From Swiss-Prot:
GO terms for biological process: protein repair. One of its GO terms (molecular function) is electron transfer activity. Belongs to the MsrQ family. Keywords: Cell inner membrane, Cell membrane, Electron transport, Flavoprotein, FMN, Heme, Iron, Membrane, Metal-binding, Transmembrane, Transmembrane helix, Transport. It comes from Escherichia fergusonii (strain ATCC 35469 / DSM 13698 / CCUG 18766 / IAM 14443 / JCM 21226 / LMG 7866 / NBRC 102419 / NCTC 12128 / CDC 0568-73). Binds 1 FMN per subunit. Binds 1 heme b (iron(II)-protoporphyrin IX) group per subunit. GO terms for cellular component: plasma membrane. Part of the MsrPQ system that repairs oxidized periplasmic proteins containing methionine sulfoxide residues (Met-O), using respiratory chain electrons. Thus protects these proteins from oxidative-stress damage caused by reactive species of oxygen and chlorine generated by the host defense mechanisms. MsrPQ is essential for the maintenance of envelope integrity under bleach stress, rescuing a wide series of structurally unrelated periplasmic proteins from methionine oxidation, including the primary periplasmic chaperone SurA and the lipoprotein Pal. This is Protein-methionine-sulfoxide reductase heme-binding subunit MsrQ. It comes from the Bacteria. Pfam families: Ferric_reduct (PF01794). The chain crosses the membrane at residues 8-28, 82-102, 116-136, 153-173.
């Protein structure tokens, strides 16, 4: 049975809750001692992982809609992408304000040079910024065929963001490897599209 437009609306409501509730949990954890002895790192990793989860969810929508024969699922893709950008922005902000501090923001450029994984992160965020800014139907009409060309850069983010995560952790752990593996799997599902580009 295919989803109806009304069911998709309720699904969007649920997805908005899924995007907002992690923020509620994080705020509670900060105020009630739910973080470790290094709360700044906890906040950075939590916001970054949440952004990655929404990135993977965004990439999942197209193959899921195709294989499950649920075309209306595509209507949730923009919503998930915007939540990905929102959490990526919180991730960047937590690094800039909590790690560097307001008085040391001038060091950000130097950090990008000395820590290449930060470069991957900021490139990913800039791409997400462009995609979020052009995600409306009006921008899609204005950009025409260039809109899809621009939004294909989400696949580059799907490569850079997991590498950024893997590179940023001090020790090898299963979680960043899992995210990288899921990203590769979701990209592999699009092999026909990539093969067409190479022709």
């Amino acid at each position: 049975m295919r989803l109806t437009a009304k069911q998709v609306i309720w699904l969007k409501v649920c997805l908005h809750l899924a995007g907002f509730l992690p923020f509620v949990w994080l705020a509670w954890a900060i105020n009630h001692g739910g973080l470790s002895a290094d709360p700044v790192k906890d906040i950075q990793h939590f916001t970054g992982r949440t952004a990655l989860k929404f990135l993977l969810a965004t990439l999942l929508i197209t193959p899921l809609a195709r294989y499950a024969k649920q075309p209306l699922l595509i209507r949730t893709r923009r919503l998930l992408g915007l939540w990905c950008f929102a959490w990526a922005t919180l991730h960047l902000t937590s690094y800039a304000l909590l790690e560097l501090g307001v008085n040391n923001l001038a060091l950000f450029g130097q950090e990008l040079i000395t820590r290449p994984y930060l470069t991957l992160g900021i490139v990913s965020w800039l791409i997400l910024l462009a995609l979020a800014f052009t995600s409306t139907q009006a921008m899609q009409r204005n950009l025409g065929k260039h809109w899809q060309q621009l939004h294909n850069f989400v696949y580059l983010v799907a490569i850079l963001a997991p590498i950024h995560y893997l590179w940023s952790v001090k020790i090898i752990s299963p979680q960043p490897i899992l995210y990288a593996g899921l990203a590769l799997l979701l990209l592999a599902l699009r092999y026909k599209k990539f093969r067409t580009w190479l022709k």
